[in-house]
Structures are given as structure tokens and as C-alpha cells.
């Protein structure tokens, strides 16, 4: 089980979002090579601008662990987190972030690369083409 394996699981979640008409972002949270949370965007379904996949996954993982910190966890997400989600990941003290495709317009790294916890290790570009292709397909269909 490597980064590609877990990113494929995150992509499965992104496809669930796509099927619901949500921006197709998916997440899995892993500790000790075990998935403890899965989530996808639910902003439209819940009518909640904060219901990003990362936020849903942070809550689910914390519930599973019985505590608010994810300092022994890796979060796999198909698209670079926005500043809101990066800030939440900082507060959760996430150990490692792995994302697929960058988000030049809304990603945290272009707005404030220091939003994540100083100890959070970041890996980007895992299955980037697959992640990017799904986003492009979604917005192409949305715009007709």
C-alpha cells in the first residue's frame, strides 16, 4: 500500500461527489496503513459552504480516533486544499498531507503556504493527471 493506492481511494470518493453534482474532491485519512475516514464534498447536498471533503474527513477521523489531533495520520486529497481546509488541518496537527493536483486559483499554497502545521509533511502531484482530469470534466459539463 503506497500513496497511489490511497489516492485511488480518494478518487473513488471524488467520483461520489461528481455523481451528486458536487465539485469532485475526495479524501481518505490513513493511520498505520489503515483507512479511518473517507469523505467527499457535500457543500451542495448540505447547503453548507464549509462542507468540504477535508472538513468532513477531519471530523470523521477525529471521531474514529476519539481525539481532535491527527498527528499520526496522513490525509490524501485529490485537489490541493483551500485556505479554510489548510487552517483546519493545522489545528488538527496533521502529520502528512498528500494531494493530487494543485489548485492555482484557490489552493492554500498560493495564498499562504504557511497555513499548515510546521511539522506537516507535504507531498504533491500523486496521480495528478487523474485528479485534474476529473475536475476538468466536471467543470466542462457544468458549463455545457
Model-derived regions, located:
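Zinc-dependent deaminase
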Residues: 1-20, 32, 81-144
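Small-residue (primarily alanine) positions within well-ordered alpha-helices
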Residues: 10, 14-17, 27, 37, ...
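Short, basic and Ser/Thr-rich N-terminal targeting/leader segments
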Residues: 21-25, 71
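Short beta-strand scaffold segments in enzyme catalytic cores
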Residues: 25-33
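Short secondary-structure boundary/capping segments
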Residues: 27, 66-67, 112-114
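Short beta->alpha transition motifs characteristic of CBS
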Residues: 36-43, 119-121
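Residues that line or immediately flank small-molecule/substrate-binding pockets and catalytic motifs
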Residues: 43, 77, 101
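Helix-adjacent hinge/juxtasegments
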Residues: 47-80, 84
Amino acid at each position: 500500500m503506497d500513496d497511489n493506492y490511497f489516492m485511488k481511494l480518494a478518487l473513488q470518493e471524488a467520483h461520489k461527489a461528481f455523481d451528486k453534482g458536487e465539485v469532485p474532491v475526495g479524501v481518505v485519512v490513513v493511520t498505520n496503513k489503515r483507512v479511518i475516514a473517507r469523505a467527499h464534498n457535500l457543500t451542495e447536498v448540505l447547503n453548507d459552504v464549509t462542507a468540504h471533503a477535508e472538513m468532513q474527513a477531519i471530523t470523521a477521523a477525529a471521531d474514529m480516533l476519539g481525539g481532535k489531533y491527527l498527528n499520526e495520520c496522513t490525509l490524501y486529497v485529490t485537489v490541493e486544499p483551500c485556505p479554510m481546509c489548510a487552517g483546519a488541518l493545522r489545528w488538527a496537527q496533521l502529520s502528512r498531507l498528500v494531494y493530487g493536483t494543485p489548485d492555482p486559483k484557490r489552493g492554500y499554497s498560493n495564498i499562504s503556504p504557511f497555513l499548515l502545521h510546521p511539522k506537516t509533511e507535504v507531498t504533491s502531484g500523486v496521480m495528478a493527471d487523474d485528479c485534474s482530469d476529473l475536475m476538468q470534466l466536471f467543470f466542462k459539463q457544468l458549463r455545457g
